[in-house]
């Protein structure tokens, strides 16, 4: 199975959406290598970065679902290297 490493950048502008986001991330916990969250109180938003290791379609499924949550923006950067596990 071909896997990719990716970094997912998430900006949370609606704090009421955090519970939905955390629930979704829990569903995909097995592909998350690391997570860093930064509250930016001066701007009333939070920034989350995820490092993931999974097939590209699974990463796309996760980011697509994140993008459907109200008040959340998401972008993904993929590594060029493909791993065959």
Question: Which residues does each PLM region occupy?
Answer:
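Long, contiguous binding/interaction regions
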Residues: 1-85
């Amino acid at each position: 199975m071909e896997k990719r490493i990716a970094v997912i950048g998430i900006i949370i502008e609606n704090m009421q959406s955090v519970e939905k986001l955390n629930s979704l991330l829990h569903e995909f916990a097995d592909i998350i290598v690391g997570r860093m969250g930064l509250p930016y109180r001066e701007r009333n938003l939070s920034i989350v970065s995820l490092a993931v290791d999974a097939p590209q379609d699974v990463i796309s499924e996760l980011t697509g679902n994140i993008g459907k949550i109200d008040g959340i923006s998401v972008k993904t950067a993929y590594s060029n290297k493909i791993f065959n596990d």
